[in-house]
Amino acid sequence: LPICEAIAACARTLGEAPDADSDLHRSDAVTLGPLRAAADRAALRRRFHDDHVHAVHRPADAASASLFESLSAARLDALGVRWLAGVAKNLVGFPGVDADGLRWLAFEQFSGVTAPPEKRDVVALARAALTPDLLTGLADLASLTTEHWGFAASAARWCATASGQVPVDVPRQAGPRFNIPDAPGGTDPRRG
């Protein structure tokens, strides 16, 4: 945009650095990429996450809680990818900070987007650690991603079942009813 170029030129001149890189968002992708992904995840959490619903359904035991956190994070990422192409690029294009196999496996199930190449090994390990019934249950959760209460309740049940069946060495990190609208332009009943 011409206005952005003009502002950048003014900033370089005022900063006495006329040769400064005016295309920082492209030239420093290694640094800014993970930052963009983190910012997108924070925005998705603010828009689609209800702390009360999460707290009500979060399992008490540590193993189930860790699984629940992975599924919850995958749900938010999938919602972002489903509606916003730029978010998809940021989340899948700059994923290097975590090695959460269950999160990426669930992300694939919930969004229909394949995990990036550097995550495929941890996804394969997570998939191999789950029984066919657990894999089916994970796929079933995909239909609930837009309804936080139902998703959280079903995810908690899935985690309670899975926590005894998922080996510890599988890579992973550890209210009011409302529906998320079917389209990004819709209204969210939580927000009025």
Task: Walk through the language-model features, giving the residues of each.
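Segments forming glycine/polar-rich beta-alpha architectures that bind adenosine-containing cofactors
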Residues: A162-G192
